Amino acid sequence: RFTHKYEVKPQFCVINFDDPRHSHRCNPINADFLTDIADAYEAAYVIMIGLNRSWAQKQGDFFVESPVVLLTAIIWFLRIYQNGKYCTFPHAIELLNKKYEEVFTILMARPELENYLSAFVDAWQGGAQEQLQGQIASAKIPLSRIISPALYWVMSGDDFSLDLNNPQAPKILCVGSNPDRQNIYSAALSLYNSRIVKTINRKGKLKCGVVIDELPTIFFKGLDNLIATARSNRVAV
């Protein structure tokens, strides 16, 4: 109805985990989004808190930080391996679920990850197997909830990017959820939301609106900052 008001006609995109046949594909940890290991940490943090909402009140706890750090290392490895060719969330989950001896051998081959993983390697080489397995399980068990062919398919493609208000390629994105699968979908949606918030709240972009329904069902990192600062960047929430 209002497409004539855009200099470039916007693309209409949908994320639908229930029926991937009616969904576009979008990789929320596309290598282009990850310019520093801090970006990988944020992605890992969002997904783990999305799966364990109570962890948001326990930042700094050993068994909260451990899975976040481990997942961060895996995501960053995928980012720097072959220029991010396999940097998708499904690849990260599958790598995490390999034998930990194989995983740490692969990760420690990267000098930039040695210090990041020192606590895990010390436990491994020091014979603290129970502690190490507990650390790894605290990442594996929550993430196992989102091992799904539908989620894997949607989250591993690049039909569109999340810079929705890009003047050269504007997009209208509709993201669907399902209250019956809230514990599964909310974590994945939280990752998309955090990425969108970072990309749209910038100077030089088109006017943009964010409409959120049933907000309490998802962890939306950065929403408070978006509300506080978005007006200057012509973003309405």
Q: Predicted segment positions?
A:
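P-loop NTPase motor domains
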Residues: R1-A236
